[in-house]
From Swiss-Prot:
Assembly, per entry: Heterodimer of AddA and AddB/RexB.
Catalytic reaction(s) noted: Couples ATP hydrolysis with the unwinding of duplex DNA by translocating in the 3'-5' direction; ATP + H2O = ADP + phosphate + H(+)
Record's keyword terms, sorted: ATP-binding, DNA damage, DNA repair, DNA-binding, Exonuclease, Helicase, Hydrolase, Isomerase, Nuclease, Nucleotide-binding
UvrD-like helicase C-terminal domain: residues covered: 519-809
Origin superkingdom: Bacteria
Entry-linked Gene3D superfamilies: 3.90.320.10, P-loop containing nucleotide triphosphate hydrolases, PCRA, domain 4
High-level lineage: Bacteria, Bacillati, Bacillota, Bacilli, Lactobacillales
EC number: 3.1.-.-, 5.6.2.4
Species for this entry: Streptococcus sanguinis (strain SK36)
Pfam families named among the record's database cross-references: PDDEXK_1 (PF12705), UvrD-helicase (PF00580), UvrD_C (PF13361)
GO terms under biological process: double-strand break repair via homologous recombination
Gene: addA
Name of the molecule in the record: ATP-dependent helicase/nuclease subunit A
C-alpha cells in the first residue's frame, strides 16, 4: 500500500478545533489529538493517572497503519506480558472494525495483512524481544539458540552460592589473602558466617544487571566516590548549612526577646539567650570556616549549660495558661534548632576523623571491585555451561550484538518506522540503551508518568524520564513534550483530594518532581465533574486498643494492620453493601505489602464477606500439604531421617498417634541403644525390640502396612520419574482426594498438583533424581526463600486485597488504603554498602584506631565503624530517592479510586495533635518536615494541621472502640441460600432416581450427537488430509501399487542396533523447514551462506548431515527460487493461520490451524509454496497426496486477503533430483 503523508502541525490544529466544536458526548482532548498524530521527532507523553494513555497509543498505532505503515514496522515495548496481550486485543478489534469500513481493495488487503501479522508483531516486554534477538543472532557471540531462562530466584541462588564458594576459595588462597581477609572482616566482623559479605556481593551484582554495561560501570564508576572525595567541598557545603542554621537561630532569639520574651523578663534563660546573640553577632557573610566553627562551638557549649536546659523557658505551676502556652511554643520551636546545631558540631568532628582514615579503605574497595568482577564472570561462565541465563544476561547479550555488529543494528533501525514504549517512567538503563540502539534518533514515542514510578527495587530509574521531560520542556528541538492531565477514570472528589495532598507534598527537592498546575489532575469525564458530597475522600484513623496479634513481631517484618483498622473497614463495607447496594467486586483493599495480612483474611471470613487476596505470595513450601509430601519424599530418599519419618507417620496418610509413636520409640535392639526410628520400626516388625510387649497386634498390622507401602515407593522411585512417583503416592494413599475435602481444598489440591509439575520441570533441566530434588528444596528453605503460591479460580463477586504495586494500571470503584501508619521500609539505608549510578560505591569502613591509655588492661587499639564520605553522599541520595518513591506509591494508591477513596490508619488524636508540624513554605509542608516523616498518615495529618484554614478535599475522623462493637459493625444482609435443615428433608431414593434420570438423558444425548462430540474443536491440515487423499495416508513412505511391488527397489539400510537413535524422516523434514526459514533472501545464497544457516538450525548433527545443501542451492536457480529472491520483501515464511471449517458428518464447525511454509503476496495474486522431503519415485503420487492440503492453504489465503488467484507449488526435495511442481 502506498504511504499516506502524516499530518502537519496546521492539520493537527484544525483537527483539534473540529473535535472541540463537535457535539460528541466524550471528546478527545487537544493533547490526546496531538499525541495521536504528531510525527517527525521524538515524542514524550507525560500521561497522568486515568488520562487515556492506552487509548492514545492504540489510536496512534491504528493511524500509522492506515497511512501504510505495517505492524511489523513498529516496535512496541510494554511493561508486562499482560499489558502486551491487552494491547494486541485492542488493536485486533480496531483493525477488524477498520477492515469492515475500508472501501478500497488496496486498503482492505493491507489491513487484512496487518491482522494476519499482528500475532507475530514486536509487541511485548523488552525481555521477550531481547530473547528473540539472542535466538536469532546469538551465534555471533557463540551462544546456542535453545537457551532456557533462569526465572526461579531459588535456582539462581543455588548457582550463585556454588560459584561464590569457588571464587571465595580462590581469593582466600591467593597472594592477596591478608587483604582479602580484612575485606571480609569489614563486613562480617568476628562472625565466621560469610553471609554478610556474600549478601553485599549479590547486591552489587544485582545492581550491575540493571546497568547497560556492567563491566564498564565497574571499571569507570565503581571507585568514583573514593577517587574524587573532596573533603574541602563537603566542609564548605556543611558550613553553608551551619551559617543558615545560626542565622535562623539568631532571628528566632531576637524576635522572641522583642515580643513574647517580655513576659519572661529577668528569667535566667534570657541571660543565656542574650549571650548567644552576642556570639552570633560576630557571624557575617565573609566569616571564614574557622570563624564559623568557633561560633558554632560557643553556641553548642552555651546550650549545654544547666544540664542542657540553658535556653529553656520555665514557668511556675501557678502561672496563667497564656504564659504556659507561650513558654511551650517557644521551647518546642527552639529545641529542633539547637539539636540541629549540635548535630552539625558532631558532623564536623566525624568528618575530620573520616578524612584521616578513608584512604586506608581504598585498597579494600579496589579488591571488592575485583572480587565482584570475577564473581560476575565466573557466574556467567557457569550459566553458559548450563545454557541457562537470567533476563539481565540476555539483555546485555542483545546490547553487545547491536553494538558490536553494525549490520544487525542497521537491520532493526531500518525495519522500525517507530520505536514505542509504554510505562517509560519504569525504564532502567539497560532498557534505555536497547531503545537507543533500535531507534534512528528521531523516531521514538515514549509514554509514562513519573508520578507513578514505583519500581526502584527493580532498578527502574525515574531520572531517565525526568531528564527527558526537562530537556524537551526547555528545548523543543530535542523532542516534543505532550502532557495529558485530564483524568477520565475518577470522580471529582477523588481528583481534588489527590491534588490537595500532592500540591502540598511533592516538589523537586523532596519528590523529584514539582507537582504544579502542569500535573494537577483535571476531571475529563463530564459525567464525573458534578460534585457529590457523599464521595468526599475519608481519612479514617482508628483510635483504640484492638491490636494485631503480631504487634510485637520482628523488626525486619512489615508492620501488620491492626484489628481495629480491619473492623473499621468491615463496618464501612457492610454499610456500603447493605445500604447503597455496592457489589463486593467493586471494592478493593490496598496494602503496602502482601505479607502479614492473615488478620484481614480471618476477619472477613468471620463476617462472611468474600475476599480474594493478591496471588503470588512466596509461601508455597510452607503449606501443610506440601510439607507432608516433602517429608514423604525425604523418607523415600532416606528412611533414616527421623524428622521426615516421624512427620510421615503422623500425617493423614498413615495417622499414627502420639501413643503409637511412643511405643515405637522404645523398640531399640538389645545390641544397640542408639538407633534411628526406622531401625526401631524394623525391630518392632521382627519382634527384636527391647519392649516387644508394647507393640500390640493392631500396631503390628499398621507398621507392616506402612513398611510395605514405603518399600514399594522406594522400589518404584528407582525406575520411574519424580512426577510418576508423586502421583503414585497421591493415588496409593488417596492423599490428593483427601486434602480436597479440607477447608480451601481447591487451593490445597492446586498446590499438590503444582508439586508434581515442578518436579517434572526440574527433571527436564540438567538436574535429575529424587536426592538432588530434595537437596534443592532444602537449600531453598535454608536460604529462607520459597516458591510462589499457586493461584486458583476466585469467586466473581468478592472484595479484592492486593498490594499498591499490583494495583498499578487498574481501577476500582471503592478503594481502601490500609495501614497508613505503617513505617516506610528503610532497610536499604542501614546497609553496609550503598550504590549510586553516578557516584559508584560507598561502604561503611571498620578502622583500626590506636589509642593512648594509661590502664594496662585497656586495649590500645579499637575497631571503629565509620560512614565514609562516599557512603554518606550515597546515603543522602538514596534517602531522597526512597522518600520520593513513597510519595509516588501514595499517588498510585489514591488514583486507583473511581468513586470514593478511604485512607485508613491508626493513631492517637492527642499524640498527633501534640506533634509540631511547623509552618508552610511556599504553599507546601517544609522540606525538613517532609524528609523526617516516616509514614503516609503523618504526611496527611501534617497537611491537615498546617493548612487547617483551607478547605481540604478530604475529611479526617477518629474512630473509637465504642463505634466498633459487634452491634455497631453489623452483618451482611444476604438471604440464606441453603438452610441448615435442607439436607434433613432430602430423601436418598429421590436423589438416586434423579441421578439415574440424568444419566439416561446424558446417554441419549451422547448417542444422538456422537459425531459432534468426537469432533475436535481444533484440527490441523495433516489431521484432515485423509478426507482429500485418494489413497491411504502414509506420509513419508513410498506408496507401492501391485505392479510396483515387482519392480527392483533401492537397497535399504539394515537395522541399527547401536546406541545411536536412527534419524527419522520427520526429523529431517523439520530441520529442512527451519533451514529454509533461516536462509536470507537478499541475494541468491552461496554454499557458504547455506552452511552458515544450517549451523543455526536446532537439530542434531546426524540430522543435519542428511540435508543435501546442493538441492537447496539448486532450488534458488529455478524460476520460483529466483522469483523469491527478486521479491524478497513480498515473501512470507512460516506464517500461522486459522480458519473456520464445517464438519460434514456432524454439521458442527471447528477451527483449522496450521503453518504455511511460505507464500509470495502480490496485489492481484498469491504464489503458495510448500517443501516436502518425502521419499518418492513418481512425483504424481505426492501431488495427489498433498493436493487437498494445498487447497486448504489456498482457501485460507484467499479468505484472508480477498484474492482469488492462488498459484500452488510443491518443492520436492526427497527424490534423486530437486523438483518444483505446480499443482493445479
Amino acid at each position: 500500500m502506498k504511504r499516506i503523508p502524516f499530518l502537519t502541525a496546521e492539520e493537527i490544529a484544525l483537527k483539534q478545533a473540529q473535535e472541540a466544536a463537535s457535539d460528541k458526548p466524550q471528546k478527545k482532548t487537544a493533547e490526546q489529538i496531538e499525541a495521536i498524530y504528531s510525527s517527525g521527532r521524538n515524542i514524550l507523553v507525560s500521561a497522568s493517572a486515568g488520562s487515556g494513555k492506552t487509548f492514545v497509543m492504540v489510536q496512534r498505532i491504528i493511524d500509522q497503519i492506515l497511512r501504510g505503515v505495517a505492524v511489523s514496522q513498529l516496535f512496541i515495548s510494554t511493561f508486562t506480558v499482560k499489558a502486551a496481550g491487552e494491547l494486541k486485543e485492542r488493536l485486533e478489534k480496531e483493525l477488524g472494525q477498520a477492515l469492515k469500513e475500508a472501501e478500497s481493495p488496496e486498503l482492505k488487503q493491507h489491513l487484512a495483512q496487518q491482522l494476519a501479522d499482528l500475532p507475530n508483531a514486536d509487541i511485548g516486554t523488552m525481555d521477550s524481544f531481547t530473547q528473540k534477538v539472542l535466538s536469532r543472532y546469538g551465534y555471533l557471540l557463540g551462544l546456542a539458540p535453545n537457551f532456557r531462562i533462569l526465572q526461579s530466584a531459588s535456582e539462581q541462588l543455588i548457582l550463585q552460592n556454588e560459584v561464590f564458594s569457588q571464587v571465595f576459595d580462590h581469593y582466600y588462597d591467593s597472594e592477596r589473602q591478608a587483604l582479602f581477609s580484612r575485606l571480609v572482616k569489614n563486613f562480617t566482623g568476628k562472625r565466621k558466617d560469610l553471609s554478610a559479605f556474600r549478601e553485599q556481593v549479590y547486591r552489587i551484582y544485582s545492581f550491575l544487571q540493571s546497568t547497560s554495561s556492567p563491566q564498564r560501570w565497574l571499571e569507570e564508576t565503581f571507585l568514583y566516590g573514593y577517587e574524587h572525595s573532596d573533603f574541602a567541598a563537603e566542609r564548605e557545603r556543611i558550613f553553608c548549612q551551619i551559617k543558615s542554621a545560626l542565622w535562623e537561630l539568631e532571628t528566632f532569639f531576637s524576635a522572641h526577646l522583642e515580643h513574647e520574651g517580655r513576659e519572661f523578663a529577668g528569667a535566667k534563660y534570657q541571660e543565656n539567650v542574650q549571650d548567644a546573640l552576642t556570639v552570633l553577632a560576630g557571624l557575617n557573610e565573609s566569616s571564614s570556616i574557622e570563624e564559623t566553627a568557633q561560633i558554632l562551638k560557643q553556641i553548642v557549649a552555651l546550650s549545654q549549660l544547666s544540664n542542657g536546659q540553658a535556653f529553656t523557658a520555665r514557668v511556675g505551676k501557678n502561672a496563667d495558661e497564656l504564659k504556659k502556652e507561650m513558654a511551650k511554643d517557644y521551647n518546642e520551636a527552639r529545641k529542633p534548632m539547637i539539636e540541629r546545631l549540635r548535630s552539625f558540631d558532631q558532623q564536623l568532628y566525624q568528618l575530620d576523623f573520616i578524612e584521616q582514615h578513608q584512604d586506608e579503605c581504598l585498597p579494600l574497595v579496589e579488591l571488592l571491585r575485583d572480587f565482584v568482577a570475577d564473581f560476575a564472570q565466573a557466574y556467567l561462565e557457569r550459566k553458559k555451561a548450563e545454557n541457562a541465563f537470567e533476563f539481565g544476561d540476555i539483555s546485555h547479550f542483545a546490547i553487545e550484538i547491536l553494538e558490536t555488529f553494525p549490520e544487525v543494528r542497521r537491520f532493526y533501525q531500518e525495519r522500525y518506522h517507530e520505536v514505542m514504549v509504554d510505562e517509560y517512567q519504569d525504564t532502567n538503563h539497560t532498557q534505555e540503551r536497547m531503545l537507543d540502539l533500535l531507534s534512528r534518533g528521531k523516531n521514538r514515542f515514549m509514554v509514562g508518568d513519573i508520578k507513578q514510578s514505583i519500581y526502584r527495587f527493580r532498578q527502574a530509574d525515574p531520572q531517565i524520564f525526568s531528564d527527558k521531560f526537562k530537556a524537551y520542556q526547555e528545548d523543543s528541538s530535542q523532542g516534543k513534550l505532550i502532557v495529558l492531565k485530564e483524568n477520565f477514570r475518577s470522580h471529582l472528589e477523588v481528583l481534588e483530594a489527590t491534588n490537595d495532598v500532592f500540591k502540598r507534598l511533592m516538589d523537586e527537592e523532596v519528590g523529584e518532581i514539582d507537582y504544579n498546575e502542569t500535573h494537577y489532575l483535571v476531571a475529563g469525564n463530564p459525567a464525573k465533574r458534578e460534585p457529590n458530597p457523599a464521595n468526599r475522600a475519608s481519612f479514617l484513623i482508628y483510635e483504640g486498643s484492638k491490636e494485631s496479634p503480631e504487634e510485637e513481631a520482628d523488626e525486619g517484618l512489615p508492620q501488620a494492620v491492626s484489628a481495629g483498622e480491619v473492623d473499621l473497614v468491615i463496618k464501612e463495607i457492610i454499610r456500603l453493601h447493605n445500604e447503597e447496594g455496592v457489589a463486593f467486586k467493586d471494592i478493593t483493599l490496598l496494602t503496602a505489602s502482601r505479607t502479614r495480612n492473615d488478620l484481614i483474611l480471618a476477619a472477613f471470613e468471620q463476617h462472611q464477606i468474600p475476599l480474594v487476596p493478591d496471588d503470588g505470595a512466596a509461601n508455597y513450601l510452607q503449606s501443610v500439604e506440601v510439607l507432608v509430601m516433602l517429608d514423604t519424599l525425604r523418607t523415600i530418599n532416606n528412611p533414616l531421617n527421623d524428622y521426615a519419618l516421624t512427620a510421615l507417620l503422623k500425617s493423614p496418610m498413615f495417622d499414627f498417634g502420639e501413643d503409637e509413636l511412643a511405643r515405637l520409640s522404645l523398640q531399640a535392639s538389645q545390641e544397640r541403644s542408639q538407633e534411628n526410628l526406622y531401625e526401631k520400626l524394623v525391630n518392632a516388625l521382627e519382634g527384636r525390640g527391647l519392649n516387644p510387649a508394647l507393640v500390640t497386634e493392631e500396631l503390628q498390622k499398621k507398621l507392616q502396612h506402612f513398611y510395605e507401602t514405603l518399600q514399594s515407593w522406594r522400589t518404584y522411585s528407582k525406575t520411574h520419574s519424580l512426577y510418576d512417583l508423586i502421583w503414585k503416592i497421591y493415588q496409593d494413599r488417596f492423599y490428593y482426594d483427601m486434602v480436597g475435602t479440607l477447608v480451601n481444598g481447591a487451593q490445597r489440591q492446586a498446590n499438590l498438583y503444582a508439586l508434581s509439575l515442578r518436579a517434572n520441570e526440574y527433571e527436564k533441566s540438567s538436574f535429575k533424581g529424587l536426592s538432588r530434588f530434595i537437596g534443592m528444596i532444602d537449600r531453598i528453605l535454608e536460604n529462607q526463600h520459597d516458591l510462589a503460591s499457586v493461584p486458583v479460580a476466585a469467586p466473581k463477586d468478592a472484595v479484592r486485597l492486593m498490594t499498591i504495586h499490583k494495583s498499578k494500571g487498574l481501577e476500582f470503584k471503592y478503594v481502601f488504603l490500609l495501614n497508613m501508619d505503617k513505617a516506610f521500609n528503610r532497610q536499604d539505608s542501614s546497609s553496609a554498602i550503598i550504590l549510586s549510578r553516578t557516584k559508584g560505591v560507598g561502604i561503611k569502613y571498620v578502622a583500626d584506631v590506636s589509642v593512648s591509655v594509661k590502664d594496662s588492661y585497656a586495649p590500645n587499639q579499637l575497631r571503629i565503624s565509620m560512614d565514609t564520605l562516599p557512603y554518606q553522599q550515597n546515603l543522602a541520595e538514596l534517602q531522597l530517592a526512597s522518600l520520593s518513591e513513597q510519595m509516588r506509591l501514595l499517588y498510585v494508591a489514591m488514583t486507583r479510586a473511581e468513586t470514593k477513596l478511604y485512607l485508613v490508619g491508626k493513631g492517637s488524636q492527642e499524640a498527633l495533635d501534640k506533634r509540631q508540624w511547623g509552618k508552610s513554605q511556599q504553599g507546601r509542608l517544609s522540606a525538613s518536615l517532609r524528609s523526617q516523616i516516616s509514614n503516609f498518615q503523618d504526611w496527611l495529618y501534617a497537611i491537615q494541621d498546617v493548612f487547617s484554614d483551607e478547605n481540604l478535599a478530604y475529611e479526617t475522623r477518629f474512630v473509637t472502640d465504642e463505634e466498633l462493637t459487634a452491634e455497631e459493625i453489623g452483618r451482611i444482609n444476604e438471604p440464606v441460600l441453603f438452610p441448615a435443615d435442607d439436607l434433613a428433608d432430602n430423601r436418598q431414593s429421590d436423589d438416586i432416581r434423579r441421578a439415574l434420570d440424568i444419566l439416561e438423558s446424558v446417554d441419549r444425548l451422547n448417542s444422538q450427537y456422537r459425531s459432534a462430540i468426537e469432533l475436535p474443536s481444533v484440527r490441523t491440515p495433516s489431521q484432515i488430509k485423509k478426507f482429500y487423499e485418494p489413497i491411504m495416508d502414509t506420509d513419508g513412505l513410498d506408496i507401492m501399487d501391485e505392479r510396483a511391488a515387482f519392480r527392483p527397489q533401492p537397497s535399504f539400510e539394515l537395522p541399527d542396533f547401536g546406541k545411536k537413535a536412527k534419524v527419522t524422516g520427520a526429523q529431517v523434514g523439520s530441520a529442512v523447514h527451519e533451514l529454509m526459514q533461516r536462509i536470507p533472501l537478499d541475494s541468491s545464497p552461496s554454499m557458504a551462506v547455506l552452511r552458515s544457516a544450517l549451523a543455526q538450525v536446532q537439530a542434531d548433527d546426524a540430522v543435519k548431515k542428511q540435508i543435501q545443501l546442493s538441492k537447496i542451492a539448486s532450488f534458488f536457480e529455478t524460476d520460483l527460487g529466483r522469483l523469491l529472491i527478486e521479491n524478497s520483501d513480498r515473501v512470507r515464511r512460516e506464517a500461522p493461520f486459522a480458519m473456520l471449517k464445517r464438519d460434514e458428518a456432524s454439521g458442527q464447525e471447528f477451527v483449522l490451524r496450521g503453518i504455511l511454509d511460505g507464500y509470495l503476496l502480490f496485489e492481484d495474486r498469491i504464489i503458495l509454496f510448500d517443501y516436502k522431503t518425502d521419499k518418492y519415485k513418481d512425483s504424481s503420487e505426492l501431488i495427489a497426496r498433498y493436493r487437498g492440503q494445498l487447497d486448504l492453504y489456498a482457501q485460507a489465503l484467499s479468505r484472508s486477503y480477498g484474492i482469488s488467484q492462488i498459484e500452488k507449488y510443491l518443492i520436492l526435495l526427497g527424490g534423486e533430483q530437486l523438483q518444483v511442481v505446480k499443482v493445479d
